From Swiss-Prot:
Function: Thiol-specific peroxidase that catalyzes the reduction of hydrogen peroxide and organic hydroperoxides to water and alcohols, respectively. Plays a role in cell protection against oxidative stress by detoxifying peroxides. May be an antioxidant enzyme particularly in the developing shoot and photosynthesizing leaf.
Species of provenance: Oryza sativa subsp. japonica (Rice)
Gene designation: BAS1
Matches recorded under InterPro entries: AhpC/TSA, Peroxiredoxin, Peroxiredoxin_C, Thioredoxin-like_sf, Thioredoxin_domain
Domain Thioredoxin: 68-227
UniProt cross-references to Pfam families, sorted A to Z: 1-cysPrx_C, AhpC-TSA
Keyword Disulfide bond assigned: yes
EC number: 1.11.1.24
Name of the molecule in the record: 2-Cys peroxiredoxin BAS1, chloroplastic
Note: The active site is a conserved redox-active cysteine residue, the peroxidatic cysteine (C(P)), which makes the nucleophilic attack on the peroxide substrate. The peroxide oxidizes the C(P)-SH to cysteine sulfenic acid (C(P)-SOH), which then reacts with another cysteine residue, the resolving cysteine (C(R)), to form a disulfide bridge. The disulfide is subsequently reduced by an appropriate electron donor to complete the catalytic cycle. In this typical 2-Cys peroxiredoxin, C(R) is provided by the other dimeric subunit to form an intersubunit disulfide.
Length: 261
């Protein structure tokens, strides 16, 4: 299973890494709704060394060199998803010209860190909606697994009702096209992409398996992106939030900014 309670892992690393121990295969495809499986703790063999334990949540994605870069068009996809306890289809390009998109990947359903992120985004969904932004979650699990997880109470490790779709990437093609797939494990790293209304990736961040993402920072980055797109002659300095002073990206403008802070 995907990691949650372990020593901190680094962000995507160029060094080779050991596979994540104890992750079972994704929920099997079935026409009948599966019962939510009980979460099993990650176990390492007694012979594992201290260094092996420390690196057990460090994984490396394949195809990173081919991953979509900030400033390029996001790879399109058309996939099945679960929303409002129904099966729907989601096509990324349908949002072009209409909405910003927060697209985030997570390793597996019925795990540990993942539900904390997924429910946190759902709890803040109305704030993103006011910024004309849709949220899309993606994992390699089937829609049946997604549905079972949504139908499981939060107090039991489930998600409860969500305000945005969970996309099924059983072919792993979406994860691969965004450069977050870990080939030898068949799951995705915690990648997050902010895509503007033109379908262009404006921000990306990829955490390793043990590190959850911040909804607050995602919101702040989205607000900064929208500000500079509305004010193309200005830039946002470090930690900028709505109401803070921005900067003109020229010698005179920068001097005015630094003199004012």
């Amino acid at each position: 299973m995907a990691a949650c309670c372990s020593s901190l892992a680094t962000a995507v690393s160029s060094s080779s890494a050991k596979p994540l121990a104890g992750i079972p295969p994704a929920a099997p495809h079935s026409l009948s709704l599966p019962r939510a499986p009980a979460a099993r703790p990650l176990r390492l063999s007694a012979s594992s060394s201290r260094s092996a334990r420390a690196s057990s949540f460090v994984a490396r994605a394949g195809g990173v060199d081919d991953a979509p870069l900030v400033g390029n068009k996001a790879p399109d996809f058309d996939a099945e998803a679960v929303f409002d306890q129904e099966f729907i289809n989601v096509k990324l390009s349908d949002y072009i010209g209409k909405k910003y998109v927060i697209l985030f990947f997570y390793p597996l359903d019925f795990t540990f860190v993942c539900p904390t992120e997924i429910t946190a985004f759902s709890d803040r969904y109305d704030e993103f909606e006011k910024l004309n932004t849709e949220i899309l979650g993606v994992s390699i699990d089937s829609v049946f697994s997604h549905l079972a997880w949504v139908q499981t109470d939060r107090k039991s490790g489930g998600l409860g009702d969500l305000k945005y779709p969970l996309i099924s990437d059983v072919t792993k093609s979406i994860s691969k096209s965004f450069g977050v797939l870990i080939p030898d494990q068949g799951i995705a790293l915690r990648g997050l992409f902010i895509i503007d209304k033109e379908g262009v990736i404006q921000h990306s961040t990829i955490n390793n398996l043990a590190i959850g993402r911040s909804v607050d920072e995602t919101m702040r980055t989205l607000q900064a992106l929208q500000y500079v797109q509305d004010n193309p002659d200005e830039v946002c300095p470090a930690g900028w939030k709505p109401g803070d002073k921005s900067m003109k990206p020229d010698p005179k403008g920068s001097k005015e900014y630094f003199a004012a802070i």
